[in-house]
Amino acid sequence: MYQLLFQRLGVTLTAGNDKKTSIPSNQLVGHLIGLILLCDDLNEAFADFQALLQNGIAISSSDRGYLVFDAHVTDCGCHLRAQMIQDVFSYFKNHEVTKLYIFDAVAKKLNELKRHCISLIQTLCWENTSAQKLGFPKNIKSYEELLKLLQWDTADISSAIADSFPMNPNNADQNEKGLVWNVTKLEVVLEFLYCSHFLSKNKIYNKKENLDSVTIDFNNAFEKRQLLSNKFHCQGTGKLGVGCRYLKHAKQSKNSFISVVSNLQSRLALLSIAFLKSRCTLPCDIEALQKNSPRNVSAIPNFLHFLILEREWSQNETPILLAVRKLHEHEHCDLYFEARINPHTFEWTLQHKECCEFEHHTPYIVITALATGSSTTKTAQLLAWELMKAQKNFRQFWLTFMSQHRQYPFEIEHDEDQLLETQVSQDIFELYCQSKREDRNQILFDDSTSLLPKHIFTEYPSIFFNFQKNVCSKHGALVI
């Protein structure tokens, strides 16, 4: 079970990112606080997921549903995570009675570990008791040894997990090349939910004059972590006062926190590639198309994302909600369409709908887009009519957009063309080249009207509509 909740998430590595690096006794309190915060993060993610399945709303954020799992990663793969959460939702929704209790069992063990850590900190830090007197060695060899010393034992739930999930979590392959996307494997689901939730709650929307974007708010997130840490250590008021030997190491450094975030982004990007591999029926090798950024975030060309997803969405009849925002000066109006993809031709069909006409208890793939150019002088009815008229061209629009969309890290070395030419079939490469040459703005409209996709995610329609009302940025729909 170490692999299940800790090795799998990378937290068995010490601050030096080396499994062999030991934990000195004067750093013990800091690592215990780190485990406490991790337990809270895990429990919050799992509780939100259960609440969404059972009640359709997240506990941690009353105005969001599955948006609490809308992670920020630099691989331009938001549409992949949208389908991944759809996969997880569908699996657990169909097995709710027999599967969901696992999250309660895991939460119980995490709470036990948290209480043990808090009690130990009280003894070490406030009562100034030597760690050696409590049976701890001067240097703890690894996080695995620390967890054993903390009596982290999940034998009482291992059998229940084995009964409900075909793959024993203890046998999880830690080799990145062996990483697979399989929602019947509990360790995969737990990692995905935790990484997605953490990277969602710590992101912020930037609303600049000419650009909307999203990033991790490191300053605010780090400050929150520090405030949480202060609740557990003595802050220099214990028996040794300001000279407390644990105080120096009780708080995580900002650089260490940034490394944790980068590690979670890297893991989620790898899971996204594993998802692509599990769904790919194209004549290509996904691993050979993988490129790693200087920050160790892996990516596959966006063009292939779409070719794989259009097959996935059409075969599963995945409900798609296209939300188009039209801006004019300081006013805006929103148009909503339900989209379907033909599994044989991959052509799109659109149905213009009002908010009340969507299935509000079904999570949709939501695509937000911004209409600009001549659209500002058009009525909402005319713009909706033009989009309906152009629906036969929507596939080509998406192929063109995905082939031209700037994607990190491919934009650094400009080698995407060469990579695709050598790794995909001639038909796919020719389709890519043709799409990349086209003028995206001329595919759907005859005038200067332009449609710019902003973001793709999974959400219940009712929650999305309420959330959309509050996102009235001057230059964006639902900012990415």
Swiss-Prot record:
The keyword Ribonucleoprotein does not apply. The keyword ATP-binding does not apply. It comes from the Eukaryota. Pathway: Siderophore biosynthesis. GO terms for molecular function: ligase activity. Disruption phenotype: Impairs pulcherrimin production and subsequent red pigmentation. Its EC number is 6.-.-.-. Keywords: Ligase. Probable cyclodipeptide synthase; part of the PUL gene cluster that mediates the formation of pulcherrimin, a red iron-containing pigment composed of two cyclized and modified leucine molecules that acts as a siderophore, a chelator that binds iron outside the cell for subsequent uptake. Two leucine molecules are cyclized via a cyclodipeptide synthase, and the resulting diketopiperazine is oxidized by a cytochrome P450 monooxygenase to generate pulcherriminic acid (PA), which can then spontaneously bind iron to form pulcherrimin. This is Probable cyclodipeptide synthase PUL1. It comes from Kluyveromyces lactis (strain ATCC 8585 / CBS 2359 / DSM 70799 / NBRC 1267 / NRRL Y-1140 / WM37) (Yeast). The lineage of its organism: Eukaryota, Fungi, Dikarya, Ascomycota, Saccharomycotina. The gene is PUL1.
